[in-house]
Amino acid sequence: MRSPKVKFLTIFTFCIFITKMSFASNSCSNEAGTMFRIEPNLIKAIALVESNLKKDSIGKNRDKNNNIKSLDYWLMQINQMHIPLLKKRGIIKDERDLLDNPCLNIKIGTEILYNHFSRCGVTWQCLGTYNAGFAMDNQKKRQQYAPKYILYIPGLMN
């Protein structure tokens, strides 16, 4: 059984980590929003919906047979399909960079969202492509995905 002191230190450390993450997320979301002309509250909402701000979260995308077909990394759940281009551009060395640097993850995710908006317009349907992609058979998934942000944005506006 842990002593009260150890429990306190564990909780204290966790609180500092969450506070640090929150400040980093706010600062980085604001910076990324300015860089790509996207509302910072939307960026924060995406991070909340995608990863629930869970450190080192790696999403596993599965096919109909439950086989892993791709991975998504941390805050903005950057899909592994982006890794080769990010390496080629010198932005990352490997996927670990997406897990170790929250600001970098937020900026890359925001750039991906910017590219989606440039392709299909600033609409809720286009926002759904951030998670579900552009495939025609993902139409229903896109429509279900975008409204999830609406739940988070009002609380972020305060």
From Swiss-Prot:
CDD domains: LT_IagB-like
Keywords, sorted A to Z: Periplasm, Signal
Subcellular location: Periplasm
UniProt GO cellular component terms: periplasmic space
Nucleotide-binding is among the record's keywords: no
InterPro entries recorded: Lysozyme-like_dom_sf, Transglycosylase_SLT_dom_1
Major localization listed first in the record, in broad terms: periplasm
Signal peptide interval: 1-24
Coiled coil: none
Membrane spanning residue stretches: none
Protein family (similarity comment): Belongs to the IagB/IpgF/P19 family.
Protein's recorded name: Putative peptidoglycan-binding-like protein
